[in-house]
A protein has these predicted regions:
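Charged, low-complexity, helix/coiled-coil-prone segments
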Residues: 11, 50-59, 90-97, 126-128, ...
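Ferredoxin-reductase
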Residues: 19-114, 171-173
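FNR/FR-type flavoprotein reductase catalytic core
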Residues: 3, 9, 102-184
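Accessible peptide chain termini
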Residues: 1-3, 16
Length: 184
């Protein structure tokens, strides 16, 4: 809906309240981030926990559940990856990737302590304010669950603000089930 206050790609670097992200002078500028942790989710799927190198960027970066960043590997290229963190837990950003393409394979070779670049956030966040005091059903499949993980985290941390929550996630095999440690 055009009247929604959730920001979108036309205003990168904004948070879900329509307030400009104050972390960067230019939201298109690549910000260096250190890999703090690398978590194996399933075969060829990993979550990278990142921390911005610059403290001002770390303090000022805001995003809405459902937005994504452009993740840049120096000398290789960049790829759009969903932010799978709760925006209410600042300081660290989680991004889950399937290691299949040239850029994601380069990301997959990185280790904790290595640095990559981030631009964003981009996209329209999920309309979670509209779901307050209502039941929520989330339906996903495969790695398609990544864009809603931030929303799930957000809802779980504010459980008293939402009705019943049902998550239906389809996968080929039990080994393909992602985020077990996070949601079990």
């Amino acid at each position: 809906r055009p009247d929604r206050r959730v920001t979108g790609a036309s205003n990168p670097g904004s948070n879900m309240n329509g307030v400009a992200n104050q972390c960067c002078q230019n939201p298109y500028e690549i910000q260096p981030a250190t890999i703090v942790e690398k978590i194996s989710e399933a075969e060829d799927i990993e979550t990278f926990r990142l921390r911005f190198v610059n403290q001002a960027t770390r303090r000022g970066f805001r995003f809405a559940p459902g937005q994504f960043n452009m993740v840049y590997v120096f000398g290789v290229g960049e790829v759009a990856i969903s932010i799978v963190s709760d925006p209410g837990q600042p300081g660290l950003l989680d991004h889950t990737i399937r290691v299949v393409g040239r850029v994601t394979k380069a990301i997959g070779r990185l280790k904790p302590g290595d640095v990559l670049g981030l631009r964003g956030p981009y996209g329209v966040g999920w309309p979670l304010d509209e779901a307050r005091d209502k039941d929520v059903i989330i339906v996903t499949g495969g790695l398609g669950c990544a864009p809603v993980v931030g929303a799930i985290e957000y809802i779980f941390r504010r459980r008293d603000q939402y009705g019943a929550v049902k998550i239906l996630h389809g996968v080929k095999t039990p080994h393909d089930l992602l985020y077990r440690a996070r949601f079990d």
